[in-house]
Amino acid sequence: MSRRRGKVEPRKITPDPVYNDVQVAKFINCLMLSGKKSVAEQLFYDALEIIQKKTGNDPYTTFREALENAKPQVEVKSRRVGGVTYQVPVEVRPERRLALGIRWLIRYSRDRNEKGMAAKLAAEFIEAQKGTGSAIKKKEDIRKMAEANKAFSHYRW
């Protein structure tokens, strides 16, 4: 069912103060728990400092590449046709692509074994930049599932 009053305008997110980047601000907002934004900001910037110490590379570039590598191109959606549920591969919209990439990086960072959230984030960013890590594995699993169900792509809506 469509909306009566047209499209909803997306909220404007103010860029973060250090890198002046909206994607960094979104990442910090998703990292935040219980409204504690200053804690989330500190964790994020500490993680970037850890990346600087470990690799010697530009931490901001590492973050951007890690996020880009974690973004999925395709995903599968369930579609019920005649009593049978098919997993239909669909292309992911750019906004959702960013949201999923951020969500997966944070989720799999929290599951890691390093001491402290900043160290966990840093390790996940470094691995995601290299093309390894749990967030990248999740992306690849979904891509493989979409590839396996390519035969049902004509059921798109």
Curated annotation (Swiss-Prot):
MF terms (GO), sorted A to Z: mRNA binding; rRNA binding; structural constituent of ribosome; tRNA binding
Pfam families: Ribosomal_S7 (PF00177)
Highest taxon of source: Bacteria
InterPro entries for the chain: Ribosomal_uS7, Ribosomal_uS7_bac/org-type, Ribosomal_uS7_dom, Ribosomal_uS7_dom_sf
Family note: Belongs to the universal ribosomal protein uS7 family.
PANTHER family to which the protein is assigned, alphabetical: RIBOSOMAL PROTEIN S7 (PTHR11205)
Function: One of the primary rRNA binding proteins, it binds directly to 16S rRNA where it nucleates assembly of the head domain of the 30S subunit. Is located at the subunit interface close to the decoding center, probably blocks exit of the E-site tRNA.
Entry protein name: Small ribosomal subunit protein uS7
Species of provenance: Leptospira interrogans serogroup Icterohaemorrhagiae serovar Lai (strain 56601)
Native organism taxonomy: Bacteria, Pseudomonadati, Spirochaetota, Spirochaetia, Leptospirales
